[in-house]
């Protein structure tokens, strides 16, 4: 039987991303999040407006979207309740957040140079996407939530993939049987189980989905 419900959060289960950006002093900030939508070589991020990630992104227009697997769950969890914003915003204080500048050290992850953007990649993450800001749009424009939550459209310019998760014989295809993303569902971490059912859409060659946006593009 269905009942009417009002859950405070609607995290039905999406992959976790670690967003690396550059602080004003050139050090790196690293923030976990899971409000992501990928369409072609574009990524839509939903971020809290008072976060250090948003501050850095607005200033530099660059980030790396690092995709951890289940193997990095402990590192991701070590970043929980940390913020690079000082002083800590009141809403985050109420939730037990504290200021931490050395995010890579706290997570025990390794920064490595990117090839196009300035923020570093996370060595341990099997997938790393160098991206640049295209557009920003506030949620609830003109309403009480304006400024609190904002969506950012990111254009992916370069993708780095650990070769162990590539499909055999295909340099440009990720094998879903090898890639095990970390999933965040209602504030808890999960991994993927085995394939639930054969997909008829999976019979379509991935190359047929290619769009002009997927051509690797160097910054102007």
Which ranges hold each PLM region?
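Basic, polyanion-binding surface patches
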Residues: 1-220
């Amino acid at each position: 039987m269905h009942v009417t419900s009002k859950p405070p959060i609607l995290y039905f289960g999406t992959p976790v991303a670690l967003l690396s950006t550059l602080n004003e002093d050139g050090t790196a900030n690293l923030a976990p999040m899971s409000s992501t939508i990928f369409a072609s070589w574009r990524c839509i991020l939903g971020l809290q407006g008072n976060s250090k990630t948003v501050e850095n992104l607005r200033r530099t227009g660059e980030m790396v979207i690092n995709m951890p697997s289940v193997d990095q769950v402990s590192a991701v969890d070590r970043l929980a309740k940390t913020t690079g914003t000082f002083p800590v915003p009141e809403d985050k204080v109420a939730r037990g957040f504290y200021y931490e500048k050395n995010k890579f050290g706290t997570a025990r992850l390794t920064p490595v140079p990117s090839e196009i953007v300035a923020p570093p990649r996370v060595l341990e993450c099997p997938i790393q996407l160098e991206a640049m800001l295209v557009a920003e749009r506030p949620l609830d424009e003109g309403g009480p939530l304006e400024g609190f939550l904002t969506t950012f459209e990111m254009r992916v310019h370069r993708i780095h993939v650990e070769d162990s998760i590539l499909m055999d014989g295909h340099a440009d295809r990720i094998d879903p049987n090898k890639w095990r993303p970390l999933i965040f569902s209602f504030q808890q971490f999960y991994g993927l189980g085995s394939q639930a059912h054969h997909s008829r859409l999976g019979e379509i060659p991935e190359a047929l989905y290619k769009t002009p946006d997927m051509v690797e593009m160097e910054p102007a």
